[in-house]
Amino acid sequence: MLPYKKKENGLIIDCFKENTTWNMIYDLYVFDRKLRLLVFDAIERLEIAIRTQIIYQLSHKYGSHWQDNPNIFKAPERRVLRDGSIVTFDVYAEIQKHISEQLRSNRAEVFIQHYRNKYDTPVNPPSWMSVEVMYFSHLSRICTGLKNRADISGIANYFSLPPQIFCSWIHSINYIRNLCAHHARLWNREMSIVPEKLHFSKILTWISNPDTVQRGKIYYFFCMLDYLLQTANPTSSFKERLKTLLDEYKNVVSLPAMGFSEGWENEKMWK
C-alpha cells in the first residue's frame, strides 16, 4: 500500500493519496502475487540445471561421493555479524548434517529409503541422490564453499559466467527465491542482497549498458534470470510471460519503481 500513501517532508505518512481506491490497492497485490509465481517457476527450472551441473562437474573430478570429501571445501570460517555475534560457516559440516537428517527422516524420498535399506557403506548415498534432496541454499553454499577455483569454474562456465559473478548471482537468486516462498512483496523491493555486475557477454545476450541499471532492483534480477535461462532452459517462455504480465498491469505498476531503465523493451535480450 505504500505507493498510495502520502509523503510529508520526504516521509511516508499514514494517509492515502487523493483518488486512491480499494481496487487499485487490490490490483497491485494481485500483480505482485502473479509476479512471485512467475519468478518462482523460472527459478525452479534454473535450479534443476544448477543442481545437474554441480553433480556432473564434481562427480567427474572427485567421484560419486565428492560431497563426503572435506578436502574439496574451504576450511570453517568464523565471521562477526553486525550485532557483534560470532558465527562459524562450515559448508562441509552443513551439507553433511542435512544428508544425515534426510537419511534418518521417516518421510525420506523413496530413493533415499532404498539406499538406507540396501547399503551399509558408504553411509551416505552418492552425490546424485544426496544433492537431489538439498535445498537451493545448499547449492549456493556449495558453489561459494568449494576450495579450488577450478571446481566452480567448470560449473560457472556452463552458464557463460565468471566464477565470482556466478556465485554472487546464485546467492541473490536464493534470496529472491526465499522472498517468493514466504509471500514477501517483490515488485518494488530494495534488495538487501545486491548481485555483482556483469559488464558484457561475448556468448549470450545481455544488457547493452549495465551501468544504467540499478542492481538492487527487481529488473536487474529479471535480466539475470533471463541470461541464465538462455543456457538452462532455452525454450523458456519466462520473458514472454513477464512482458505479458507487465502489459496486463501497465496502469497499475510503475516500471521505474521496479528498476526498469528507459528503453528497456528495445534491449536485444527482451526482443
List the predicted regions and their residue ranges:
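Long, contiguous internal "core" modules enriched in hydrophobic/ aromatic residues
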Residues: 1-271
